[in-house]
Amino acid sequence: MKILDLIKSRRSIMPNQYNRSLIEDRDINLILDAANWAPSHKKTEPWRYKVLKNKTKDDFGKFLGKKYKESTPNFSNFIHNNLIEKTKKSSVIILICMQRDPNESLPEWEEIASVSMSVQNMWLMATNLK
């Protein structure tokens, strides 16, 4: 696929569109490898990813539901249950994290931008794999 076609065809897939098919480890590794090729100023490579599957993924959904319940004054049972169900519909969840340069040698926004670019690389690789 040509790069411009790939960029134009990238779309977000929402949980109600999931088809419950498993994502192969090989594909997850390709997606994570693409993320590592994002540019980062001063080579800080601030992106960190955590891959959740099976029970860990389901436990994360319960954690989200619990935190929502603890922190929301206008609690909604629908939203609470939806948070938990969305994680169950996913075969894999990749958590996006950022680790600042310990020396803070560049502005935080530059590291956020690097993480954002690595996520874009992930989306493009996932689109290419479909």
Describe these PLM feature segments.
Residues 1-89:
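N-terminal amphipathic, basic helical "cap/leader" segment at the start of enzyme domains
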Residues 11, 98-101:
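Short, histidine-centered active-site or binding-site loop motifs used for metal coordination
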Residues 35, 100-130:
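Small-aliphatic-rich amphipathic alpha-helix that forms the alpha element of a beta-alpha
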Residues 93-97:
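Active-site-flanking beta-strand signature of metal-NTP-handling nucleotidyl enzymes
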